[in-house]
């Protein structure tokens, strides 16, 4: 036996049966004996969570209806109908477009147990299709931005969260509001590098104590400025993410250059003071010796 989730067991049986057509929420499978089929069927029948998906009176083993789900040894063929789970994101999704319609995914929660039919991909598979990886990256970005936002606004009638960023300067403040989403068009955009945003999260600050607070402030200010100047929504921000990153890098470079110049001036002043003190002490010592 394995530690498969019920959904993973259903996916394994679906693949073993040759991935037949799915009729709505019902999946009819014809299975010939194989060690792999035997293991998966026993996982299905012995797990209370998995066996609930077996349609009653539609489990036939070697031509005989199986009433108690006690799969006999040495079976030859099985006909079984399953009712696929539909009550959460942990289900069979016909396409990646179906997956991203779930509000939890749009809010940055990448699911841990799901299957995309047209990609033949389950979330525990080793090889991740590019489209799925992009959804995962956008989810990571949404989560990171959510932690960097000054606050979340859920007062809208649709109940969807909006991330509010505030820029303060010269006693005045500006704000930018982003409503996270994932659209099918976004899957055609260039790969999104979300590392810089994740590094600025509070729980990552221990890894970079140098100017961490300043970097976070520069990022927020750049985001507000960039969104307002271009009147971008979240999708447009993702589309132009590389340009935004460049704007942030430029602003950060300006800050660091100013900081280094200020630090250099302080170092020079300190060195001059130290030299002056040492020179003064040397002169005083020499004068004392002469007078003595």
Put a short name on every predicted segment.
Residues 12, 43, 52, 56-58, ...:
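Glutamate identity and glutamate-enriched acidic tracts
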Residues 262-292:
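Transmembrane alpha-helical segments and their cytosolic interface motifs
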Residues 243-268:
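Short, charged cytosolic
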Residues 68-250:
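Extended, non-transmembrane interaction/recognition domains
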Residues 1-127:
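Long, contiguous, compositionally biased segments that the model treats as domain-scale units
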Residues 1-3, 145, 283:
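Polar low-complexity intrinsically disordered regions
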